[in-house]
Amino acid sequence: MIHESIEEFLAALPRSGALIGLDLGTKTIGVAVTDGLRRIATPLLTIRRTKFTEDAARLRAITAERGLVGIVLGLPRNMDGSEGPRAQSTRAFARNLSQVLPLPIGYWDERLSTVAAERALIEADTSRKRRAEVIDHVAAGYILQGVLDRLDWLGRERNA
């Protein structure tokens, strides 16, 4: 099931279990995962996109291997908050993915996540070639960590 708000997404998740974060591009999908306590996001890999069925099979295998309980998709909004063709494409991907992966799906605003990932890689003195190889899954890690920080804050609010 797809959840528009992060609060709805949190309510749909089991109390524990790792999540997968996706940074969807036209040619690649950046993948990051969390630990079971949902404290830290770790960039995992970049999938070179082919057909949806093959991409979905790869994601299904990763979620099964790692026992993941939810999916976070970066939603590429414009700087004014509106949604363009890339956001519509992401929503279509989520609808298709929800048909083959019965896990809660939540969206997270991914504005500037790739910029932040690029800056972090430059600060770490990563070569251009290496940055090109890892940028998508590092961006997925930024997206997923943003969600984890928000979920942590919401959890503290509930218990206050």
Swiss-Prot record:
EC number(s) on file: 3.1.-.-
Arranged from A to Z, the UniProt key words for this protein are: Cytoplasm, Hydrolase, Nuclease, Ribosome biogenesis
**Keyword Hydrolase (UniProt):** yes
Q: Name one GO molecular function term.
A: nuclease activity
Offer a single GO CC term for the protein.
cytosol
Which SUPFAM superfamilies is this protein grouped with? Ribonuclease H-like
What sort of enzyme, by top EC class, is this? hydrolase
Q: Which InterPro entries match?
A: RNaseH-like_sf, YqgF, YqgF/RNaseH-like_dom, YqgF/RNaseH-like_dom_sf
Location in the cell reads: Cytoplasm
Q: Which CDD domains match?
A: YqgF (cd16964)
Q: Which GO terms describe its biological process?
A: rRNA 5'-end processing
Q: Name the protein family.
A: Belongs to the YqgF nuclease family.
Q: What does this protein do?
A: Could be a nuclease involved in processing of the 5'-end of pre-16S rRNA.
Q: What is this protein called?
A: Putative pre-16S rRNA nuclease
